[in-house]
Protein backbone atom coordinates (compact mmCIF):
# COMPACT_ATOMS: atom_id res chain seq x y z
CA UNK A 1 0.00 0.00 0.00
CA UNK A 2 1.26 3.45 -0.95
CA UNK A 3 0.14 6.53 0.99
CA UNK A 4 -0.08 10.13 -0.18
CA UNK A 5 -0.78 12.45 2.75
CA UNK A 6 -2.09 15.92 1.91
CA UNK A 7 -1.78 18.74 4.45
CA UNK A 8 -2.57 22.43 4.21
CA UNK A 9 -0.94 25.60 5.41
CA UNK A 10 -1.43 29.37 5.69
CA UNK A 11 -5.25 29.29 5.70
CA UNK A 12 -8.23 27.00 5.30
CA UNK A 13 -10.26 26.73 2.14
CA UNK A 14 -7.28 26.38 -0.20
CA UNK A 15 -8.68 23.34 -1.96
CA UNK A 16 -6.91 20.46 -0.23
CA UNK A 17 -9.88 18.23 -0.97
CA UNK A 18 -9.85 18.98 -4.69
CA UNK A 19 -6.07 18.61 -4.75
CA UNK A 20 -6.37 15.23 -3.04
CA UNK A 21 -9.07 14.08 -5.46
CA UNK A 22 -7.11 15.39 -8.44
CA UNK A 23 -3.90 13.55 -7.52
CA UNK A 24 -5.98 10.41 -7.08
CA UNK A 25 -7.50 10.98 -10.52
CA UNK A 26 -4.05 11.31 -12.11
CA UNK A 27 -3.07 7.93 -10.69
CA UNK A 28 -6.39 6.34 -11.63
CA UNK A 29 -5.86 7.54 -15.20
CA UNK A 30 -2.63 5.52 -15.11
CA UNK A 31 -4.49 2.36 -14.19
CA UNK A 32 -3.94 2.35 -10.42
CA UNK A 33 -6.67 1.56 -7.91
CA UNK A 34 -7.06 4.55 -5.60
CA UNK A 35 -8.93 5.01 -2.34
CA UNK A 36 -9.18 8.06 -0.10
CA UNK A 37 -9.45 8.96 3.59
CA UNK A 38 -10.53 12.30 5.03
CA UNK A 39 -9.37 13.28 8.51
CA UNK A 40 -11.60 15.88 10.18
CA UNK A 41 -10.06 17.11 13.45
CA UNK A 42 -13.34 18.25 15.00
CA UNK A 43 -14.74 16.53 18.10
CA UNK A 44 -18.04 15.67 16.41
CA UNK A 45 -18.50 11.97 15.67
CA UNK A 46 -19.57 12.87 12.13
CA UNK A 47 -21.00 15.76 10.11
CA UNK A 48 -24.63 14.69 10.53
CA UNK A 49 -25.62 17.18 13.23
CA UNK A 50 -23.45 20.08 12.05
CA UNK A 51 -24.94 23.35 10.82
CA UNK A 52 -24.69 23.40 7.00
CA UNK A 53 -24.21 27.18 7.06
CA UNK A 54 -20.97 26.64 8.98
CA UNK A 55 -19.78 23.31 7.64
CA UNK A 56 -21.27 23.04 4.17
CA UNK A 57 -23.05 20.05 2.69
CA UNK A 58 -23.49 16.84 4.62
CA UNK A 59 -22.60 14.17 2.08
CA UNK A 60 -24.22 10.74 2.52
CA UNK A 61 -22.28 7.57 1.75
CA UNK A 62 -23.74 4.28 0.58
CA UNK A 63 -23.55 2.77 4.08
CA UNK A 64 -25.35 5.77 5.57
CA UNK A 65 -22.30 7.67 6.77
CA UNK A 66 -22.90 11.41 7.11
CA UNK A 67 -19.60 12.98 6.15
CA UNK A 68 -17.72 16.04 4.97
CA UNK A 69 -18.38 17.25 1.43
CA UNK A 70 -14.78 16.42 0.45
CA UNK A 71 -15.71 12.74 0.38
CA UNK A 72 -18.27 13.62 -2.25
CA UNK A 73 -15.49 15.06 -4.37
CA UNK A 74 -13.41 11.92 -3.85
CA UNK A 75 -16.29 9.76 -5.07
CA UNK A 76 -17.02 11.98 -8.07
CA UNK A 77 -13.38 12.29 -9.17
CA UNK A 78 -12.39 8.68 -8.53
CA UNK A 79 -15.64 6.86 -9.41
CA UNK A 80 -15.59 4.95 -6.12
CA UNK A 81 -18.04 4.29 -3.29
CA UNK A 82 -16.51 5.09 0.08
CA UNK A 83 -17.71 4.00 3.51
CA UNK A 84 -17.99 5.60 6.93
CA UNK A 85 -14.55 4.34 7.96
CA UNK A 86 -13.03 6.54 5.25
CA UNK A 87 -13.93 9.59 7.34
CA UNK A 88 -11.86 9.78 10.54
CA UNK A 89 -12.84 12.40 13.13
CA UNK A 90 -11.40 13.28 16.51
CA UNK A 91 -14.76 12.30 17.97
CA UNK A 92 -14.55 8.79 16.54
CA UNK A 93 -10.94 8.35 17.63
CA UNK A 94 -11.52 9.46 21.21
CA UNK A 95 -14.73 7.43 21.47
CA UNK A 96 -12.90 4.30 20.32
CA UNK A 97 -10.05 4.84 22.79
CA UNK A 98 -12.39 5.53 25.71
CA UNK A 99 -14.43 2.42 24.90
CA UNK A 100 -11.23 0.36 24.88
CA UNK A 101 -10.21 1.84 28.22
CA UNK A 102 -13.60 0.99 29.74
CA UNK A 103 -13.28 -2.59 28.50
CA UNK A 104 -9.86 -2.87 30.07
CA UNK A 105 -8.04 -3.31 26.79
CA UNK A 106 -5.10 -1.21 27.99
CA UNK A 107 -4.53 -3.40 31.06
CA UNK A 108 -4.55 -0.52 33.51
CA UNK A 109 -2.13 1.72 31.61
CA UNK A 110 -2.45 5.49 31.86
CA UNK A 111 -4.21 6.43 28.62
CA UNK A 112 -2.39 9.24 26.81
CA UNK A 113 -2.34 11.09 23.49
CA UNK A 114 0.91 9.27 22.70
CA UNK A 115 0.77 6.33 22.21
CA UNK A 116 -2.92 5.51 22.62
CA UNK A 117 -4.59 8.22 20.54
CA UNK A 118 -1.90 8.18 17.86
CA UNK A 119 -2.01 4.38 17.68
CA UNK A 120 -5.77 4.53 17.18
CA UNK A 121 -5.35 7.10 14.41
CA UNK A 122 -2.80 4.92 12.68
CA UNK A 123 -5.09 1.91 12.99
CA UNK A 124 -8.03 3.86 11.54
CA UNK A 125 -5.97 5.04 8.56
CA UNK A 126 -4.60 1.56 7.84
CA UNK A 127 -8.01 -0.10 8.20
CA UNK A 128 -9.66 2.40 5.85
CA UNK A 129 -6.84 2.04 3.32
CA UNK A 130 -7.35 -1.74 3.20
CA UNK A 131 -11.13 -1.49 2.73
CA UNK A 132 -12.22 -2.27 -0.82
CA UNK A 133 -14.23 0.59 -2.28
CA UNK A 134 -15.98 -0.92 -5.28
CA UNK A 135 -16.19 -4.54 -4.25
CA UNK A 136 -12.90 -5.27 -5.98
CA UNK A 137 -9.34 -5.63 -4.82
CA UNK A 138 -7.55 -3.52 -2.23
CA UNK A 139 -6.34 -0.20 -3.62
CA UNK A 140 -2.77 0.42 -4.74
CA UNK A 141 -2.69 3.96 -3.36
CA UNK A 142 -4.49 5.60 -0.45
CA UNK A 143 -4.93 9.36 -0.45
CA UNK A 144 -5.10 10.81 3.08
CA UNK A 145 -6.26 14.40 3.53
CA UNK A 146 -5.61 15.95 6.93
CA UNK A 147 -8.28 18.60 7.46
CA UNK A 148 -7.56 21.98 8.97
CA UNK A 149 -4.32 23.94 8.80
CA UNK A 150 -0.86 23.07 10.08
CA UNK A 151 -0.55 24.70 13.49
CA UNK A 152 -4.15 24.07 14.54
CA UNK A 153 -4.18 22.44 17.96
CA UNK A 154 -6.91 20.03 16.84
CA UNK A 155 -4.66 18.59 14.10
CA UNK A 156 -1.61 17.88 16.27
CA UNK A 157 -2.36 14.22 17.18
CA UNK A 158 -3.10 13.40 13.55
CA UNK A 159 0.10 14.96 12.26
CA UNK A 160 2.05 13.13 14.97
CA UNK A 161 0.46 9.86 13.83
CA UNK A 162 1.45 10.69 10.25
CA UNK A 163 5.01 11.39 11.42
CA UNK A 164 5.16 7.99 13.09
CA UNK A 165 3.78 6.22 10.01
CA UNK A 166 6.23 8.08 7.80
CA UNK A 167 9.11 6.89 9.96
CA UNK A 168 7.95 3.27 9.96
CA UNK A 169 7.28 2.98 6.24
CA UNK A 170 9.83 2.79 3.46
CA UNK A 171 10.49 6.16 1.77
CA UNK A 172 8.77 4.96 -1.41
CA UNK A 173 5.60 3.97 0.48
CA UNK A 174 4.54 7.39 1.80
CA UNK A 175 4.94 10.91 0.48
CA UNK A 176 3.77 14.22 1.91
CA UNK A 177 2.04 16.84 -0.22
CA UNK A 178 1.67 20.30 1.32
CA UNK A 179 -0.87 22.73 -0.15
CA UNK A 180 -0.07 26.38 0.53
CA UNK A 181 -1.12 29.84 -0.56
CA UNK A 182 1.16 31.99 -2.69
CA UNK A 183 -0.63 35.36 -2.83
CA UNK A 184 0.05 38.10 -5.34
CA UNK A 185 0.70 41.66 -4.16
CA UNK A 186 -0.61 44.85 -5.74
CA UNK A 187 2.44 45.01 -8.00
CA UNK A 188 1.73 41.57 -9.44
CA UNK A 189 4.56 39.81 -7.61
CA UNK A 190 4.07 36.45 -5.91
CA UNK A 191 4.87 36.40 -2.19
CA UNK A 192 6.47 33.21 -0.92
CA UNK A 193 6.84 34.12 2.75
CA UNK A 194 3.52 32.49 3.83
CA UNK A 195 4.65 29.23 2.22
CA UNK A 196 8.04 29.44 3.90
CA UNK A 197 6.46 29.88 7.32
CA UNK A 198 3.94 27.12 6.67
CA UNK A 199 6.65 24.61 5.76
CA UNK A 200 8.66 25.74 8.78
CA UNK A 201 5.66 24.96 11.02
CA UNK A 202 5.34 21.54 9.40
CA UNK A 203 9.03 20.81 9.92
CA UNK A 204 8.73 21.69 13.59
CA UNK A 205 6.33 18.75 13.83
CA UNK A 206 8.90 16.44 12.26
CA UNK A 207 7.41 16.43 8.76
CA UNK A 208 9.24 17.50 5.60
CA UNK A 209 7.01 17.86 2.52
CA UNK A 210 8.02 16.00 -0.61
CA UNK A 211 5.79 18.07 -2.87
CA UNK A 212 4.42 21.60 -2.54
CA UNK A 213 1.22 22.52 -4.37
CA UNK A 214 1.24 26.31 -4.56
CA UNK A 215 -2.26 27.75 -4.79
CA UNK A 216 -2.46 31.13 -6.48
CA UNK A 217 -4.62 33.33 -8.66
CA UNK A 218 -2.33 32.80 -11.66
CA UNK A 219 0.41 30.48 -12.87
CA UNK A 220 3.57 30.62 -10.75
CA UNK A 221 6.70 31.07 -12.81
CA UNK A 222 10.10 29.36 -12.61
CA UNK A 223 11.69 32.07 -10.47
CA UNK A 224 9.01 31.82 -7.80
CA UNK A 225 9.26 28.02 -7.84
CA UNK A 226 13.03 28.26 -7.44
CA UNK A 227 12.63 30.59 -4.46
CA UNK A 228 10.14 28.25 -2.78
CA UNK A 229 12.46 25.34 -3.44
CA UNK A 230 15.43 27.14 -1.90
CA UNK A 231 13.63 27.92 1.34
CA UNK A 232 11.80 24.59 1.75
CA UNK A 233 14.29 21.98 0.50
CA UNK A 234 11.70 20.72 -1.95
CA UNK A 235 13.10 20.13 -5.46
CA UNK A 236 11.96 22.61 -8.09
CA UNK A 237 10.31 19.80 -10.07
CA UNK A 238 8.15 19.08 -7.00
CA UNK A 239 6.95 22.67 -6.57
CA UNK A 240 3.68 22.63 -8.48
CA UNK A 241 1.63 25.63 -9.54
CA UNK A 242 -2.12 25.28 -9.00
CA UNK A 243 -3.88 28.39 -10.19
CA UNK A 244 -7.56 29.16 -9.67
CA UNK A 245 -9.74 27.32 -12.18
CA UNK A 246 -13.33 28.10 -13.24
CA UNK A 247 -14.19 24.40 -13.15
CA UNK A 248 -12.83 21.95 -10.58
CA UNK A 249 -12.72 19.16 -13.18
CA UNK A 250 -10.03 21.09 -15.07
CA UNK A 251 -7.64 20.84 -12.13
CA UNK A 252 -6.35 17.29 -12.80
CA UNK A 253 -5.53 18.37 -16.34
CA UNK A 254 -3.66 21.44 -15.08
CA UNK A 255 -1.71 19.36 -12.56
CA UNK A 256 -0.90 16.85 -15.31
CA UNK A 257 0.61 19.67 -17.36
CA UNK A 258 2.68 20.68 -14.32
CA UNK A 259 4.19 17.20 -14.23
CA UNK A 260 2.79 16.33 -10.81
CA UNK A 261 1.88 12.76 -11.75
CA UNK A 262 5.41 12.13 -13.00
CA UNK A 263 6.86 13.31 -9.68
CA UNK A 264 4.39 11.25 -7.63
CA UNK A 265 5.10 8.07 -9.60
CA UNK A 266 8.84 8.65 -9.27
CA UNK A 267 8.71 9.18 -5.50
CA UNK A 268 6.43 6.17 -4.93
CA UNK A 269 8.38 3.91 -7.30
CA UNK A 270 5.26 3.39 -9.40
CA UNK A 271 5.44 2.69 -13.11
CA UNK A 272 4.59 5.94 -14.87
CA UNK A 273 2.11 4.49 -17.34
CA UNK A 274 0.60 6.35 -20.26
CA UNK A 275 -2.49 8.10 -18.87
CA UNK A 276 -5.93 7.22 -20.15
CA UNK A 277 -7.59 10.35 -21.53
CA UNK A 278 -11.21 9.13 -21.44
CA UNK A 279 -12.02 11.03 -18.24
CA UNK A 280 -10.57 14.24 -19.68
CA UNK A 281 -12.75 13.90 -22.76
CA UNK A 282 -15.84 13.60 -20.58
CA UNK A 283 -15.07 16.66 -18.45
CA UNK A 284 -13.93 18.73 -21.46
CA UNK A 285 -17.26 18.42 -23.28
CA UNK A 286 -18.06 21.71 -25.02
CA UNK A 287 -21.41 23.41 -24.56
CA UNK A 288 -23.76 24.18 -27.43
CA UNK A 289 -26.76 25.19 -25.30
CA UNK A 290 -27.40 27.07 -22.08
CA UNK A 291 -30.25 26.88 -19.58
CA UNK A 292 -31.03 28.69 -16.34
CA UNK A 293 -32.25 26.75 -13.32
CA UNK A 294 -33.70 28.40 -10.22
CA UNK A 295 -32.75 26.73 -6.94
CA UNK A 296 -35.10 27.98 -4.23
CA UNK A 297 -33.18 27.39 -1.04
CA UNK A 298 -33.00 28.09 2.67
CA UNK A 299 -29.27 28.80 2.82
CA UNK A 300 -27.43 31.39 0.77
CA UNK A 301 -24.18 29.40 0.80
CA UNK A 302 -23.54 27.37 -2.34
CA UNK A 303 -21.36 24.79 -0.57
CA UNK A 304 -24.48 23.60 1.28
CA UNK A 305 -25.74 22.29 -2.08
CA UNK A 306 -22.41 21.11 -3.51
CA UNK A 307 -23.62 17.76 -4.86
CA UNK A 308 -26.65 19.36 -6.51
CA UNK A 309 -24.44 21.90 -8.27
CA UNK A 310 -22.08 19.20 -9.47
CA UNK A 311 -24.91 16.89 -10.59
CA UNK A 312 -26.35 19.68 -12.73
CA UNK A 313 -22.88 20.09 -14.26
CA UNK A 314 -22.63 16.35 -14.93
CA UNK A 315 -26.01 16.28 -16.65
CA UNK A 316 -25.24 19.48 -18.52
CA UNK A 317 -22.00 18.09 -19.91
CA UNK A 318 -23.70 14.90 -21.03
CA UNK A 319 -26.22 17.05 -22.91
CA UNK A 320 -23.69 19.68 -24.13
CA UNK A 321 -25.63 22.22 -22.09
CA UNK A 322 -24.22 24.78 -19.70
CA UNK A 323 -26.41 25.05 -16.60
CA UNK A 324 -26.57 28.51 -15.06
CA UNK A 325 -27.92 28.46 -11.50
CA UNK A 326 -30.04 31.30 -10.16
CA UNK A 327 -30.05 31.11 -6.37
CA UNK A 328 -33.29 32.35 -4.83
CA UNK A 329 -33.89 32.86 -1.12
CA UNK A 330 -37.00 30.87 -0.19
CA UNK A 331 -38.13 33.61 2.19
CA UNK A 332 -37.69 36.68 0.01
CA UNK A 333 -38.03 35.75 -3.68
CA UNK A 334 -40.94 36.93 -5.83
CA UNK A 335 -42.81 34.80 -8.34
CA UNK A 336 -41.65 37.03 -11.20
CA UNK A 337 -38.12 35.81 -10.40
CA UNK A 338 -39.22 32.45 -11.82
CA UNK A 339 -40.74 33.76 -15.03
CA UNK A 340 -37.62 33.57 -17.20
CA UNK A 341 -35.94 30.47 -15.76
CA UNK A 342 -36.02 27.20 -17.66
CA UNK A 343 -36.55 24.96 -14.64
CA UNK A 344 -37.10 25.01 -10.87
CA UNK A 345 -35.34 22.82 -8.30
CA UNK A 346 -36.17 22.47 -4.60
CA UNK A 347 -33.35 20.83 -2.60
CA UNK A 348 -33.49 18.83 0.60
CA UNK A 349 -33.43 20.41 4.03
CA UNK A 350 -34.90 20.50 7.51
CA UNK A 351 -37.04 22.89 9.55
CA UNK A 352 -39.90 25.17 8.59
CA UNK A 353 -38.01 28.34 7.67
CA UNK A 354 -38.65 29.10 4.00
CA UNK A 355 -41.17 26.29 3.57
CA UNK A 356 -44.05 28.43 2.33
CA UNK A 357 -41.83 30.09 -0.25
CA UNK A 358 -40.74 26.73 -1.58
CA UNK A 359 -44.36 25.60 -1.81
CA UNK A 360 -45.17 28.75 -3.82
CA UNK A 361 -42.34 27.91 -6.22
CA UNK A 362 -43.59 24.33 -6.62
CA UNK A 363 -47.12 25.53 -7.34
CA UNK A 364 -45.74 27.95 -9.92
CA UNK A 365 -43.82 25.13 -11.63
CA UNK A 366 -46.87 22.86 -11.66
CA UNK A 367 -49.36 25.44 -12.91
CA UNK A 368 -47.03 27.09 -15.45
CA UNK A 369 -45.62 23.84 -16.84
CA UNK A 370 -42.07 24.68 -15.80
CA UNK A 371 -39.76 21.66 -15.43
CA UNK A 372 -39.56 20.78 -11.74
CA UNK A 373 -37.17 18.57 -9.80
CA UNK A 374 -37.77 18.06 -6.08
CA UNK A 375 -35.29 16.34 -3.79
CA UNK A 376 -36.10 14.84 -0.38
CA UNK A 377 -37.83 17.82 1.26
CA UNK A 378 -38.64 18.96 -2.28
CA UNK A 379 -40.53 15.67 -2.71
CA UNK A 380 -42.45 16.10 0.54
CA UNK A 381 -43.34 19.71 -0.27
CA UNK A 382 -44.56 18.69 -3.72
CA UNK A 383 -47.00 16.32 -2.02
CA UNK A 384 -48.09 19.05 0.40
CA UNK A 385 -48.60 21.55 -2.44
CA UNK A 386 -50.68 19.06 -4.42
CA UNK A 387 -52.76 18.21 -1.38
CA UNK A 388 -53.47 21.88 -0.67
CA UNK A 389 -54.24 23.13 -4.16
CA UNK A 390 -55.58 20.07 -5.99
CA UNK A 391 -57.22 18.05 -3.21
CA UNK A 392 -58.29 21.29 -1.51
CA UNK A 393 -56.97 20.47 1.98
CA UNK A 394 -55.72 23.96 2.77
CA UNK A 395 -53.99 23.14 6.07
CA UNK A 396 -51.99 20.24 4.63
CA UNK A 397 -48.48 20.21 6.06
CA UNK A 398 -45.76 17.99 7.47
CA UNK A 399 -45.65 16.67 11.00
CA UNK A 400 -42.20 18.24 11.14
CA UNK A 401 -43.69 21.71 10.61
CA UNK A 402 -46.38 21.71 13.29
CA UNK A 403 -50.18 21.66 13.45
CA UNK A 404 -52.38 20.90 10.47
CA UNK A 405 -53.36 17.93 8.34
CA UNK A 406 -50.25 15.81 8.28
CA UNK A 407 -49.98 14.53 4.73
CA UNK A 408 -46.29 14.02 5.57
CA UNK A 409 -45.79 11.96 8.73
CA UNK A 410 -42.86 10.75 10.76
CA UNK A 411 -41.51 7.31 9.89
CA UNK A 412 -42.86 4.74 12.40
CA UNK A 413 -39.35 3.64 13.40
CA UNK A 414 -38.45 7.27 14.15
CA UNK A 415 -41.19 7.87 16.72
CA UNK A 416 -39.14 6.72 19.71
CA UNK A 417 -35.80 8.10 18.51
CA UNK A 418 -34.28 10.71 20.85
CA UNK A 419 -30.74 11.20 19.53
CA UNK A 420 -30.29 13.27 16.38
CA UNK A 421 -26.92 11.94 15.23
CA UNK A 422 -26.88 8.96 12.87
CA UNK A 423 -30.51 8.01 13.50
CA UNK A 424 -32.27 8.97 10.26
CA UNK A 425 -33.13 6.63 7.41
CA UNK A 426 -29.69 6.81 5.83
CA UNK A 427 -27.74 5.47 2.87
CA UNK A 428 -28.58 3.06 0.06
CA UNK A 429 -32.10 1.68 -0.21
CA UNK A 430 -33.70 -0.39 -2.96
CA UNK A 431 -36.41 1.41 -4.93
CA UNK A 432 -38.89 -0.23 -7.30
CA UNK A 433 -40.13 1.89 -10.22
CA UNK A 434 -43.44 1.55 -12.08
CA UNK A 435 -43.41 0.51 -15.72
CA UNK A 436 -44.38 3.19 -18.20
CA UNK A 437 -43.53 6.16 -15.99
CA UNK A 438 -41.20 9.08 -16.58
CA UNK A 439 -38.73 7.96 -13.92
CA UNK A 440 -38.51 4.42 -15.29
CA UNK A 441 -37.78 5.82 -18.72
CA UNK A 442 -34.92 7.87 -17.27
CA UNK A 443 -33.32 4.97 -15.41
CA UNK A 444 -34.07 2.40 -18.09
CA UNK A 445 -34.97 -0.20 -15.47
CA UNK A 446 -37.44 -0.79 -12.65
CA UNK A 447 -35.04 -1.71 -9.82
CA UNK A 448 -32.62 0.98 -8.63
CA UNK A 449 -30.56 1.86 -5.56
CA UNK A 450 -30.32 5.44 -4.27
CA UNK A 451 -29.15 7.18 -1.09
CA UNK A 452 -31.48 8.59 1.55
CA UNK A 453 -31.43 10.99 4.49
CA UNK A 454 -34.82 11.66 6.07
CA UNK A 455 -37.17 11.04 9.01
CA UNK A 456 -40.55 11.70 7.36
CA UNK A 457 -42.62 10.05 4.63
CA UNK A 458 -45.88 10.42 2.73
CA UNK A 459 -48.74 9.59 5.08
CA UNK A 460 -50.22 6.31 3.75
CA UNK A 461 -53.73 7.56 4.55
CA UNK A 462 -53.54 10.12 1.70
CA UNK A 463 -51.91 8.06 -1.05
CA UNK A 464 -55.12 6.80 -2.68
CA UNK A 465 -56.71 10.28 -2.78
CA UNK A 466 -53.57 11.86 -4.21
CA UNK A 467 -53.31 9.25 -6.96
CA UNK A 468 -57.02 9.59 -7.74
CA UNK A 469 -56.38 13.33 -8.20
CA UNK A 470 -53.63 12.70 -10.77
CA UNK A 471 -50.40 12.52 -8.78
CA UNK A 472 -48.53 9.34 -9.70
CA UNK A 473 -46.31 7.66 -7.12
CA UNK A 474 -43.96 6.01 -9.58
CA UNK A 475 -41.35 4.67 -7.16
CA UNK A 476 -41.67 2.79 -3.88
CA UNK A 477 -39.58 1.03 -1.26
CA UNK A 478 -41.90 -1.44 0.40
CA UNK A 479 -44.81 0.60 1.76
CA UNK A 480 -42.96 3.92 1.36
CA UNK A 481 -43.48 6.36 -1.51
CA UNK A 482 -40.15 7.28 -3.11
CA UNK A 483 -40.98 9.11 -6.35
CA UNK A 484 -43.90 11.20 -7.57
CA UNK A 485 -44.64 12.69 -10.97
CA UNK A 486 -47.43 14.31 -12.98
CA UNK A 487 -48.02 12.62 -16.36
CA UNK A 488 -49.53 15.62 -18.19
CA UNK A 489 -46.68 17.95 -17.23
CA UNK A 490 -43.54 18.49 -19.40
CA UNK A 491 -41.35 17.40 -16.47
CA UNK A 492 -42.55 17.21 -12.90
CA UNK A 493 -40.50 14.74 -10.88
CA UNK A 494 -39.71 14.58 -7.18
CA UNK A 495 -37.74 11.96 -5.26
CA UNK A 496 -37.54 11.13 -1.57
CA UNK A 497 -33.97 10.01 -2.17
CA UNK A 498 -30.94 12.13 -3.10
CA UNK A 499 -29.85 11.11 -6.62
CA UNK A 500 -27.06 13.71 -6.52
CA UNK A 501 -25.09 11.58 -4.07
CA UNK A 502 -24.48 8.93 -6.75
CA UNK A 503 -23.81 11.25 -9.68
CA UNK A 504 -20.38 11.68 -11.26
CA UNK A 505 -18.99 13.13 -14.51
CA UNK A 506 -18.88 9.65 -16.05
CA UNK A 507 -22.26 8.55 -14.64
CA UNK A 508 -24.66 11.50 -14.51
CA UNK A 509 -27.77 10.99 -12.41
CA UNK A 510 -30.83 10.01 -14.51
CA UNK A 511 -33.25 12.44 -12.77
CA UNK A 512 -30.82 15.28 -13.41
CA UNK A 513 -30.40 14.22 -17.05
CA UNK A 514 -34.17 14.28 -17.48
CA UNK A 515 -34.48 17.63 -15.73
CA UNK A 516 -31.80 19.39 -17.78
CA UNK A 517 -33.17 17.90 -21.00
CA UNK A 518 -36.62 19.22 -20.08
CA UNK A 519 -35.10 22.63 -19.33
CA UNK A 520 -33.57 22.63 -22.82
CA UNK A 521 -36.93 21.85 -24.39
CA UNK A 522 -38.67 24.47 -22.27
CA UNK A 523 -36.12 27.09 -23.33
CA UNK A 524 -36.52 26.17 -27.00
CA UNK A 525 -40.32 26.34 -26.86
CA UNK A 526 -40.14 29.70 -25.05
CA UNK A 527 -37.84 31.10 -27.74
CA UNK A 528 -40.21 29.90 -30.46
CA UNK A 529 -43.13 31.59 -28.74
Swiss-Prot record:
It catalyses: UTP + L-glutamine + ATP + H2O = CTP + L-glutamate + ADP + phosphate + 2 H(+); L-glutamine + H2O = L-glutamate + NH4(+); UTP + NH4(+) + ATP = CTP + ADP + phosphate + 2 H(+). ATP binds at residues 13-18, 70, 243-245. Allosterically activated by GTP, when glutamine is the substrate; GTP has no effect on the reaction when ammonia is the substrate. The allosteric effector GTP functions by stabilizing the protein conformation that binds the tetrahedral intermediate(s) formed during glutamine hydrolysis. Inhibited by the product CTP, via allosteric rather than competitive inhibition. The active site is at residues 376, 498, 500. Residues 293-525 form the Glutamine amidotransferase type-1 domain. GO terms for molecular function: ATP binding; CTP synthase activity; glutaminase activity; identical protein binding; metal ion binding. CTP binds at residues 12, 152-154, 191-196, 227. Residues 1-270 are annotated as: Amidoligase domain. The keyword ATP-binding applies. It is an enzyme of class 6 (ligase). It comes from the Archaea. Its EC number is 6.3.4.2. Catalyzes the ATP-dependent amination of UTP to CTP with either L-glutamine or ammonia as the source of nitrogen. Regulates intracellular CTP levels through interactions with the four ribonucleotide triphosphates. NCBIfam families: PRK05380.1, PyrG. Homotetramer. This is CTP synthase.
Amino acid sequence: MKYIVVTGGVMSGLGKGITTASIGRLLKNRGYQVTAVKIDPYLNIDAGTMNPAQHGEVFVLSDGGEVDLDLGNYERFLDINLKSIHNITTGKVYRNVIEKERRGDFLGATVQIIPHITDEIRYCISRAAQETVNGGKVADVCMVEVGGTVGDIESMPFLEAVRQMHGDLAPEDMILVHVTLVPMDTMGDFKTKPTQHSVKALRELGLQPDIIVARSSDVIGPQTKKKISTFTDVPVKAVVSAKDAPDIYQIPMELEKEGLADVVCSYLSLENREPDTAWYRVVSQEYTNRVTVAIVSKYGIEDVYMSIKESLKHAGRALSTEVNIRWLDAETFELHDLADVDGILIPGGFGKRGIEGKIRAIRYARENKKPYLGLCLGFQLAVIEYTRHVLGIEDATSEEMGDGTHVIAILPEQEEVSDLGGTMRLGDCDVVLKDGTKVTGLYGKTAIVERHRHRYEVNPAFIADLEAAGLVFSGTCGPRMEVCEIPNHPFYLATQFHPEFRSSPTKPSPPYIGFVEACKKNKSSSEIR
